[in-house]
Structures are given as structure tokens and as C-alpha cells.
Curated annotation (Swiss-Prot):
Signal peptide: none
GO cellular component: actin cytoskeleton; cytoplasm; stereocilium
Pfam families noted in UniProt: Fascin
Described function: Acts as an actin bundling protein. May play a pivotal role in photoreceptor cell-specific events, such as disk morphogenesis.
Molecular function, one GO term: actin binding
This protein's name: Fascin-2
InterPro entries: Actin-crosslinking (IPR008999), Fascin (IPR010431), Fascin-like_dom (IPR022768), Fascin_metazoans (IPR024703)
SUPFAM superfamilies recorded: Actin-crosslinking proteins
Location within or outside the cell: Cytoplasm, Cytoskeleton; Cell projection, Stereocilium
Organism in which the protein naturally occurs: Bos taurus
UniProt entry keywords in alphabetical sequence: Actin-binding, Cell projection, Cytoplasm, Cytoskeleton
Length: 492
């Protein structure tokens, strides 16, 4: 299977939260560090790097500054070092409740404090030296077992999550990380939580919560008894094994979950590669052969469609479309034109893709009519987490409105009807637009929203008014943006 960016391991960025719920922050002015920020933004993001020398020490690099956290012998801390020296080496000591203690390796003292009174001079661990790890990545991803090189996916018949899939195909391969009570839950695509005995449960109970640990850039999930999740048995069932230290079997990568879509043509049939290499609209049900992985090129904003048979859609002679390309090229790129509830695709020959009378797709049209329009449905986000430029979308406390600047997120449920999406939140209320463009989450009836996939990993959401949903300085979600750009684009 060609890489071509299909399998992108996510760079793990995180925040560190102290005992007073404030985030470790790296300031540009004076390269000082403090713990004053109430939420996770750019200045609060850190990356863990292994120490270049041998041993268990690690380095903390500020994503914002690109510089390293250091602690001097007298306890003074800063984030000034452009290259990691001896004072930048820390030991991470995981505690039973899942929090971390950071110990200066050369000096043996512990790092902690409050507000701008941070130091690395403590000789004993108190609550002020305890840090919670909060992942800064988008929480919906694919989970890859490092030892088996297989992807985790929901097995509905066996009622389990198993790491036995060669490719993360379809909705079952989506895993959502839920941050709760300073720990993480693994949520399957049907909104159930993975318990440490391998069972799937509807509530995030204690045995369905895990402490995150990092080892050589990989993730491990430790349960409340100190054992680690691992694929077990021939089927690779995910459950806590016997090990109390993470080895290769207990390590996982998180990979970016690209949108997977189905397309319906004007004949009301699904576009498919079931009957060979020709891409045709000739099927009545949506299965793997009707599902395509869609990627958007960051520079051109054009998209590719990758099939379950291992080929990209590509333009061939006489305008035909076949799923045979093994590499991305100009002929595999399609320009998307959003037309309300429908989308039109323009191929590299400058012509629109249409459905011919025999159902085959071909890029032979100069204008868009009914045969050139397709319904495009996102199938691998039945539950949705949205992140904008300022943070995640989350219900505002004591209100029916939605915040767009939170470091915690709500999970919303998505349904689809005739080219439009309906979004349901906490308590079962639907999103709807109110007066002056406000977006509320307590609707009794579903309101239609249009999704436009504009950039890699980002979409625009269009309300019935024709305006786009945006974040902003007020932190409220509003439907009043004219263009699908900037604060009107959402990671999903």
C-alpha cells in the first residue's frame, strides 16, 4: 500500500496541568515558565523527546518556542535552551493516580509550584509537584498496535475491540480519546467505552479509564490495577494483560483519521469499485467497495479518493475514471465545487466528472448539471469533536449556547439526510441557529447543516442562512461568517 501520507503518525503534543488546574506555560518574554493559564492553547503545548544519550531521561520542548525546559542546581527553571544540555534532562515518575512527577536527572530535585512561583528544588513530592497530562491533539484517530502492526477496530459481533486489521477502513476503525477525571477513556464508534477486561460498556466507569504513559514516542494505557492494554490472543482482543511495565506489546501509535466518504450519483446509486477497476455508480448498498478515503492537498486544496482495493481514482484516456493509481499525481487530483447539498468534481483535464448512461464515471462535461452532481456523505464520524483556532467546541455551562475556546471537548452525534447533517449534543438536543446568528444546542427538531471539506483535516459548516459557523473573540459559536476560512474552519 503506498504511503502518500495515508498513514501519518500523529506527533504527540500535550499540556501539563498542576494541582490547581493551571497549565505549564512557556512565555516568549524572558523565556520564563509559569503555571497561570486556565486552558490549553499554543503557549501551553509541549513535546516529549528522548534524551540523545542512553538512559531513561527525557526532554520537554515547548511547541510554541521550540526551546527546552531546564532546571539549574539552585532550582531556577526556564525554557531558553535552543539545544538540550545537561540541565534539560528530566525523569518522568508516573504516580498511582496517573499524574506525573518531573525530577531533574542531574540534580535529583522535583519540579512544581503555582502561578509564577515554579522551581525544581523540592526534595519531597507534595501535591504541588504533581502534573496531569492533557493531550493537545485532536482526539479522534486510528490506534495502531506497534508489535502487531495492526489497527484496532470495533468487532460488533464479538462485542470487542481487536487489533487485527491491515488497514483502518470504515467507521469501525475510529477511536475517540475522552479526557475525564485526569485520565483517558477509549470510546468506540458506537459510543461505548473499552473496559480493561476487554468488555465494552456504556459508562466511563473506573475500569474504563486509563493513565497515559509515553515510551520512545509511543503511547501506553495503564489501567487502575497497574496493568497495560495490549492485543491478546490470535484475534488481538484489546484488554489489560499481565505486564506492569510497558513492552512492545503494550505500545500504540495514534494515526490521523482521514475522512472516509460514500458518494451517490444522480441515479441514486452508490459510486463503487465492486465490479472492477472502473469507478461506477451501480450499487444499492454502502460497504467497503463503496467507501473511499478522501485526502485534501494542503497547497492546491484538491482532493484524492483512495479505494479499499488499494488504488487512487485517476483520469485515464477518453476521460475515464479508474481506481488504479498507486501514487498521487496530477491525474489523481480533483477539484471540489460545493453546490449546496451536492458536490461537483473537476478532473485534471478541466472537465467535470459525470455519470454516463451505463453508470461509469467520466470527466467529459464542460458544465454542471444533474449528472455531474453527487451527494457526498462522511461515514467515519458518527460522533464528532470540533476544534477551532481557539480551542474545542463545548457546551457553555448553564446555557444552551456553545463555546469555541475550551481545552476540554464535548462529543456530538452526527446524522445525515440528503446531503445535509444534523448535529445532536448533550441531552439529545439538536443544534439550531437562533437570533443574530447564535448557535444553540437545545433544539427539539433537527436543523440541517452543510459540511464543506475545505482543507486537510478541516471543514466548514454552513447554516441554513448561507452563513458559516465560526469561533471568535467572544468564545461563542456563531453562524455569521461570509467565507469558509480562518475562524470558520474546524478540525474534525
Amino acid at each position: 500500500m503506498p504511503t502518500n501520507g495515508l498513514h501519518q503518525v500523529l506527533k504527540i503534543q500535550f499540556g501539563l496541568v498542576n494541582d490547581t488546574d493551571r497549565y505549564l506555560t512557556a512565555e516568549s518574554f524572558g523565556f520564563k515558565v509559569n503555571a497561570s493559564a486556565p486552558s490549553l492553547k499554543r503557549k501551553q503545548m509541549w513535546v516529549l523527546e528522548p534524551d540523545p544519550g542512553e538512559g531513561t531521561a527525557v526532554l520537554f520542548r515547548s511547541s510554541h518556542l521550540g526551546r527546552y525546559l531546564s532546571a539549574e542546581e539552585d532550582g531556577r527553571v526556564a525554557c531558553e535552551a535552543e539545544r538540550p544540555g545537561r540541565d534539560c534532562r528530566f525523569l518522568v515518575l508516573p504516580q498511582p493516580d496517573g499524574r506525573w512527577v518531573l525530577q531533574s536527572e542531574p540534580h535529583g530535585r522535583f519540579f512544581g509550584g503555582t502561578e509564577d512561583q515554579l522551581s525544581c528544588f523540592a526534595t519531597a513530592i507534595t501535591p504541588a509537584e504533581l502534573w496531569t497530562v492533557h493531550l493537545a491533539i485532536h482526539p479522534q484517530a486510528h490506534l495502531l498496535s506497534v508489535s502487531r502492526r495492526r489497527y484496532a477496530h470495533l468487532c460488533p459481533q464479538e462485542d470487542e475491540i481487536a487489533a487485527d486489521s491491515n488497514t483502518p477502513w470504515g467507521v469501525d476503525a475510529l477511536v475517540t480519546l475522552i479526557f475525564q477525571n485526569r485520565q483517558y477513556c477509549l470510546k468506540s464508534c458506537d459510543s461505548r467505552y473499552l473496559r480493561s477486561d476487554g468488555r465494552l460498556v456504556w459508562e466511563p466507569e473506573a475500569r474504563a479509564r486509563y493513565t497515559l504513559e509515553f515510551k520512545a514516542g509511543k503511547l501506553a494505557f495503564k489501567d487502575c490495577d497497574g496493568h497495560y492494554l495490549a492485543p491478546v490472543g490470535p484475534a488481538g482482543t484489546l484488554r489489560a494483560g499481565r505486564n506492569t511495565r510497558p513492552g512492545k506489546d503494550e505500545l500504540f501509535d495514534l494515526e490521523e483519521s482521514h475522512p472516509q466518504v460514500v458518494l451517490v450519483a444522480a441515479n441514486h446509486r452508490y459510486v463503487s469499485v465492486r465490479q472492477g477497476v472502473n469507478v461506477s455508480a451501480n450499487q444499492d448498498e454502502e460497504l467497503d467497495h463503496e467507501t473511499f478515503l478522501m485526502q485534501i492537498d494542503q497547497e492546491t486544496k484538491k482532493c484524492t479518493f483512495y479505494s479499499s482495493t488499494g488504488g487512487y481514482w485517476t483520469l485515464v484516456t477518453h476521460g475515464g475514471i479508474q481506481a488504479t493509481a498507486t501514487q498521487v499525481s496530477e491525474n489523481t487530483m480533483f477539484e471540489m465545487e460545493w453546490r449546496g447539498r451536492r458536490v461537483a468534481l473537476k478532473a485534471s483535464n478541466g472537465r467535470y466528472v459525470c455519470m454516463k448512461k451505463n453508470g461509469q464515471l467520466a470527466a467529459i462535461s464542460d458544465f454542471v448539471g444533474e449528472d455531474e452532481e453527487f451527494t457526498l456523505k462522511l461515514i467515519n464520524r458518527p460522533i464528532l469533536v470540533l476544534r477551532g483556532l481557539d480551542g474545542f467546541v463545548c457546551h457553555r455551562r448553564g446555557s444552551n449556547q456553545l463555546d469555541t475556546n475550551r481545552s476540554v471537548y464535548d462529543v456530538f452525534h452526527l446524522s445525515f439526510s440528503d446531503g445535509a447533517y444534523q448535529i445532536r449534543g448533550r441531552g439529545g438536543g439538536f443544534w439550531h441557529t437562533g437570533s443574530h446568528g447564535s448557535v444553540c444546542s437545545d433544539g427539539e427538531r433537527a436543523e440541517d447543516f452543510l459540511f464543506e471539506f475545505r482543507e486537510r483535516g478541516r471543514l466548514a459548516i454552513r447554516a441554513r442562512s448561507g452563513k458559516y459557523l465560526r469561533g471568535g473573540a467572544s468564545g461563542l459559536l456563531r453562524a455569521d461568517a461570509d467565507a469558509p476560512a480562518g475562524v470558520a474552519l474546524w478540525e474534525y
